[in-house]
């Protein structure tokens, strides 16, 4: 990547080129890289911003939230230096659907603190639902727990524009089919990772306690 970036940045037509990155926010860009980005017409960053705090660390192990937070803020600050276009492109699963309101609130607050513009309700916000591994899909939740998720999300969906639409879309997808036959597979998957990583799924998702009872 760096060799290609260096070569492109030296082209006479660099000002007509744009770049698109997807990042999981584990590595901060170096100044030399930033200086090269400034030569391009614009740079797009699709941030895999899957949650905050305990939710982030559950999904992005062994990444730590505080480091990811600083990197995200740094990317927001790049909007003050050159034309960079930043999008929230999270993948929504059983592990993080409950954290959508909190992560959206963090995004708005920190965008307004660190970016060159005020948050726009119609800017690039594009969460997508997880399809693989299938046992992590929100469609696996039993109806009782889907109702709990929907109750929290509907209550806290005080957003406007694309964020509001995104939460509603995730609720609709969650209810779109019943994959609860995969619940034992989800139980095995989460317990295996919790034991291996010394984590606890329920710290990030207390509303789902009891979901595996009887399995």
Spell out what each predicted region is.
Residues 4, 33-36, 64-75, 103-107:
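A general structural detector for well-ordered alpha-helical segments in enzyme core domains, enriched
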Residues 11-13, 39-40, 71-86, 110, ...:
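A structural motif corresponding to the C-terminal end of an alpha-helix
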Residues 94-111:
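Catalytic cores of alpha/beta
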Residues 132-154:
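PAPS-dependent sulfotransferase catalytic core
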Residues 1, 9-30, 38-70, 85-94, ...:
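Core AdoMet radical
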Residues 40-48, 100, 149-159:
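A broadly tuned preference for mixed-charge, low-complexity surface segments
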Residues 155-215:
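Radical SAM enzyme core and accessory elements
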């Amino acid at each position: 990547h760096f060799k290609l970036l260096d070569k492109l940045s030296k082209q006479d037509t660099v000002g007509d080129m744009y770049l698109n990155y997807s990042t999981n926010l584990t590595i901060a860009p170096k100044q030399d890289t930033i200086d090269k980005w400034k030569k391009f017409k614009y740079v797009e960053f699709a941030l895999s911003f899957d949650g905050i705090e305990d939710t982030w660390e559950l999904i992005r192990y062994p990444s730590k939230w505080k480091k990811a937070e600083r990197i995200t803020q740094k990317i927001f600050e790049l909007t003050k230096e050159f034309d960079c276009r930043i999008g929230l492109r999270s993948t929504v699963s059983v592990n993080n659907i409950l954290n959508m309101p909190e992560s959206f609130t963090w995004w708005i607050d920190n965008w307004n603190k660190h970016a060159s513009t005020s948050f726009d309700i119609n800017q690039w916000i594009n969460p997508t639902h997880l399809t693989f591994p299938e046992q992590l899909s929100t469609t696996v939740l039993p109806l009782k727990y889907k109702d709990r998720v929907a109750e929290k999300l509907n209550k806290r969906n005080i957003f406007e524009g694309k964020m509001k639409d995104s939460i509603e879309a995730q609720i609709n997808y969650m209810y779109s089919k019943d994959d609860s036959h995969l619940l034992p597979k989800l139980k095995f998957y989460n317990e295996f990772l919790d034991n291996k990583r010394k984590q606890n799924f329920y710290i990030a998702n207390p509303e789902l306690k009891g979901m595996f009872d009887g399995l």
